[in-house]
Amino acid sequence: MGLFPGQKAADALALVPDLVTADHDPAADRAALEALCDWCVRFSPAVAIDGDDGLFLDITGTDHLWGGEAAMLVDLVSRLARWGVPARAAIADTAGAAWALARFGPDLAIAPPGEQTAAIATLPVAALRLGDAAEAQLPRLGLHRVGQVLALPRAQLAKRFGLAAVLRLDQALGAASEALTFRRPASPWFDRLAFFEPISAPEDLARVAADALALICARLEAEGRGAKRFEVVFHRLDGRAFPVRVGLARIGRDAQRLARLVKPKLDMVDPGFGIEVVTVHAFAVEPMAAAQARLDADAAASADETLAPLIDRLVNRLGENRVWRADPFESHVPERSVVRVGPLDPPPAARWDPDRPRPVRLFKRPEAIVAIAAELPDYPPRLFTWRGRSHRVRRAEGPERIGQEWWRVGVEKGQTGPGKIRDYYRVEDDTGGRFWIFRQGLYGGEDAPKWWIHGLFG
């Protein structure tokens, strides 16, 4: 018809008067391609966008779920066709060969394993993605097919067209790897359930989620592994996907326990006109040794076995960053002596010092107070003001002198600058409140001492 990309609309309409035209909207096109990328997760967890009109799917280890590569390819293209998305697809050992076959080969082409060279040999040179300059020059040299280019000496090809052309050849043939940017982290631990009829009832969603988790957990158990994060994705008829994520404090593969964690989160799934596919992914997969069952039924379970289910429920309800444990850290500076760790992390090498009581609540940064000292130089204040409220000191213990750790890198130079000596006091006011306050600096120096509050005792 004489139409080509980049042609003016007026010229195109002159050639084809009944041509249907629409305004070009790159942002909308990109959003649609990203939505299609998310939709393809039902076929593979590893999906990458290719340019403006293509997708790569790494189907390693997933084609058996459809009964083979051919059935998977037909299902993919037919589903897209039902949604009005015409597509060409192909399968090969390498991304480059699959790209060439999908765009220039026969429809629904599948290159047998290890035979990508023969599969693409008869395709035009444009199938190699060599770039516009090389694609324009090769036909002038009488090179029209991929096989002709493959027959050239590598040195001659690199000299005339650059190393990028040789790299594209190697990527297509599998001699060089091709890095793909997947939309979500690729995971080989993937399984799926498809339904003859869409489902939407809450009890059905809970049941299929449990079934999908049972599938992936059975695979993990068969290979002696467990995982810390799981994701169940509900795929609607209209292409939208609703992921439900759960995490474990310890690696595990108990499908029933995971199903109990998923069930409260199913309220966020909007089934719409129905869910047609459920996929399940496992992340942070590690070896997991089988546990020896105890012969004495009354034996007390370990702390991990007792706490792990509770911690899992709290983490999945409140958020991963809201459930943690405070552990001691080897440091004299109070704000450096406590670190946040996972609730079931191994015990630390450092230990709490019972001879040095520390407040139940330690402030991240000390707060300034206005203090009136009773006696100098080593007595606590008899009155101090904090956050606009006055506190009269009734009892006090101290001082406990702490110096900055000059040997550590990154000592803050803020309100308690390096080299400053701190004298800490445990004080109680006339209402029973107990505070941890300190004096920064010494009397008689260049700068007047300052008073701070650093924590609260129970």
Curated annotation (Swiss-Prot):
One GO biological process term: DNA repair
Regulation: induction: Up-regulated in response to DNA damage in a RecA-dependent manner.
Keywords, comma-separated and alphabetical: DNA damage, DNA repair
Protein name (record): Protein ImuB
Role this protein plays: Along with DnaE2 and ImuA is required for the error-prone processing of DNA lesions.
Keyword Membrane part of the UniProt annotation: no
Native species: Caulobacter vibrioides (strain NA1000 / CB15N)
Tree of life domain: Bacteria
Pfam families documented for this protein: IMS (PF00817)
UniProt key word Heme: no
